């Protein structure tokens, strides 16, 4: 391990380049494997319609910046498909890591920047990920803090302004990112708290807020120019309506979820504490083999357990939060300020997801290298690598988000240009291929089609438009879509949720799809196609 640390110290750029290659290779395992008909489709159908039919994807305008950029990429490269947008997502993550390495390598040792990078990417459970609002939000959040931090300590107001500008535009990636404006309090008090200078930094705070305002005005101006402002405001009203509703996006529900998430981090912290003290007792034996065996077995057990129960985020989050807190308490200098910035991102970037932790390890872009620096010495780095390797093995063994099963079982392709280069299970490929073939005589490009409850990918694969402004009408609040204007085609998924078992068939609850079934009955729809997975209904011929 000593030789590795010395190589990184003397050759930081070569080491970082090799790390990026490793991380891209790791992501490649998940770029080409796994097929998701819900989340990925939700974004892709928005990119396809943001310019030519924005009203059909109104709900996506709560992620306006992401939708706009995705639409621009699809407009320039119309044949990218699912694979292309997965590559874009992976490259965006690597670009963010590059920015962090370039700007912070004089503050944080290169070995910890590299370890942090590996931990962030390897710790992301919900693979494969495509270019989406979650990734863009985390990347812009981290980049804004890096510029803000550099601006404060280089006394460069342009960088502070730029950091604020990125915060401003990032509000339109996810509306809850408005909480990032709270970074102004760190800017305001950083001298008083960490530099023992008893005054507040009004000037930097002013530049930061001006930057935020310019960012908001820039996106607002784009909306006006593109004719998107009305659609955005309607989508925003729907979001506020959902916050007061009874679904998973209810405000009180999300507050409870986040509070529960923070409480759940206490258990891993206690486990860390216990293992550290047991480890000290083992070290007194002064038997190197026993010491190594204890730590490796402990780390492997923890890694395999948390990944098996999908709580890897919590144990990583707890470790990183502890590192940021220690950094702030130990360092009454620039590094302490960076620790507070990283902790703020770790705490608040995740807010707004209905299950709190759905952005995975990406909110830890800054916290990971800081925690590595504070909690790990050179001898303990091998245990972090053991944890990372265990997680990598679990990714290969357990499969992908919404497409479970080992990667090596995903050998089939879907017969569609948009999914070229993507492999999935035999069952999934059969389900999509037979459905696309069966509905083809009844569905044309540009038609309006409801994919109930949340099979948005079917809209994208058929190049149809969602109805009522929502491509996942059963994925959040059905009241947002219904009542529906006109009589669109209805593709009814027989499985209640498009998750890991979306090709499974079982007896449905009578309440499942009650609203859409009532709509179909009321308007005398005809069933024209059915298989084990989907039913296609078309309106009566006028």
Annotate the PLM regions.
Residues 100-123, 289:
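Transmembrane-helix signature of polytopic, membrane-embedded enzymes
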Residues 29-46, 57-73, 79-83, 225-227, ...:
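Extracytoplasmic catalytic/substrate-binding loops of multi-pass membrane glycan-assembly enzymes
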């Amino acid at each position: 391990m000593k030789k590795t640390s010395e190589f990184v110290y003397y050759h930081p750029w070569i080491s970082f380049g090799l790390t990026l290659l490793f991380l891209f290779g790791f992501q490649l395992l998940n770029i080409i494997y796994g097929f998701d008909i819900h989340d990925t489709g939700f974004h892709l159908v928005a990119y396809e319609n943001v310019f030519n039919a924005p009203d059909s994807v109104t709900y996506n305008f709560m992620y306006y910046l992401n939708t706009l950029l995705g639409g621009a990429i699809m407009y320039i490269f119309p044949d990218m498909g699912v694979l292309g947008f997965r590559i874009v997502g992976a490259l965006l993550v690597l670009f963010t890591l590059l920015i962090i390495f370039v700007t912070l390598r004089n503050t944080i040792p290169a070995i910890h920047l590299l370890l942090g990078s590996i931990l962030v990417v390897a710790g992301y459970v919900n693979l494969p990920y495509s270019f989406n609002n979650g990734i863009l939000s985390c990347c812009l959040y981290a980049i804004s803090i890096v510029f803000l931090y550099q601006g404060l300590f280089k006394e460069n107001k342009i960088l502070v302004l730029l950091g604020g500008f990125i915060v401003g535009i990032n509000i339109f990636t996810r509306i809850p990112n408005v909480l990032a404006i709270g970074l102004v309090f760190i800017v305001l008090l950083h001298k008083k708290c960490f530099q023992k200078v008893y005054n507040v930094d009004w000037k930097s705070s002013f530049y930061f807020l001006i930057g935020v305002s310019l960012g908001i005005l820039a996106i607002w101006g784009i909306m006006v120019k593109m004719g998107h402002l009305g659609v955005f405001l309607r989508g925003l009203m729907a979001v506020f309506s959902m916050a007061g509703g009874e679904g998973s996006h209810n405000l009180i529900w999300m507050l409870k979820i986040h509070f529960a998430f923070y409480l759940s981090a206490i258990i891993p912290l206690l486990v860390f504490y216990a293992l550290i003290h047991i480890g000290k007792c083992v070290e007194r034996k002064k038997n190197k083999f026993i010491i190594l065996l204890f730590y490796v077995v402990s780390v492997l057990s923890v890694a395999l357990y948390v990944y098996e129960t999908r709580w890897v985020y919590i144990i990583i989050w707890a470790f990183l939060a502890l590192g940021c807190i220690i950094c702030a308490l130990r360092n009454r200098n620039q590094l302490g300020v960076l620790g507070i910035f990283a902790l703020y991102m770790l705490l608040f970037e995740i807010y707004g997801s209905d299950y709190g932790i759905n952005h995975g390890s990406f909110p830890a872009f800054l916290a990971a290298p800081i925690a590595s620096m504070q909690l790990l010495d050179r001898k303990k780095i091998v245990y972090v690598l053991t944890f990372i390797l265990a997680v990598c093995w679990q990714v290969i063994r357990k499969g992908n988000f919404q497409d479970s099963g080992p990667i090596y079982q995903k050998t089939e392709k879907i017969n569609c240009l948009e999914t070229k280069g993507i492999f999935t299970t035999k069952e999934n490929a059969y389900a999509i291929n037979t459905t696309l073939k069966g509905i083809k005589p009844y569905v044309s490009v540009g038609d309006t089609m409801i994919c109930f409850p949340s099979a948005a990918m079917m809209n994208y694969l058929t190049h149809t438009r969602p109805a009522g402004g929502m491509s996942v009408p059963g994925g959040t609040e059905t009241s947002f879509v219904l009542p529906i204007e006109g009589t669109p085609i209805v593709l009814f998924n027989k499985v209640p949720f498009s998750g890991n078992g979306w090709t499974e068939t079982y007896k449905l609850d009578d309440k499942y799809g009650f609203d859409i079934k009532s709509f179909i009955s009321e308007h005398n729809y005809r069933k024209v196609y059915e298989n084990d997975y989907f039913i296609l209904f078309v309106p009566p011929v006028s």
